[in-house]
Amino acid sequence: MNTKTLLALFTVICAASIIAQTSNYTAVEAAKHIGEMATVTDRVDGVHQSGKGNIFLNMGGKYPNQMFTAFIPTASAGQFRNFQQYEGRTVTVSGKIALYRGKPEIVVTAPSQLTIK
């Protein structure tokens, strides 16, 4: 194998290792991990679409007492036409945990970030 092939293989293995090591947290635990790339798994207690088209999947309680939100911006909402299906279901949300108005959230821009357990 030449050097370029070995380097490419090494890069792929490292990337796969990092992805496999993504931490998994509950809605309550997410607040302790702001800034991390992670997966949050919990029950969706409330679903709402704003007048502007943003979708909110609230976990760990209903709004405004939720512990975590999976936020789907208007620009991505068209990919989640049946978003009501998540209410009452346990889901996993993957992405970077951020803090918005004192609550942890992950911005979801692709269906691959959100799965029903």
Predicted regions located by residue number:
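Sec-dependent N-terminal signal peptides
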Residues: 5-14
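N-terminal secretory signal peptides that target proteins for export/translocation
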Residues: 1-2
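OB-fold and OB-like single-stranded nucleic-acid-recognition modules
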Residues: 18-117
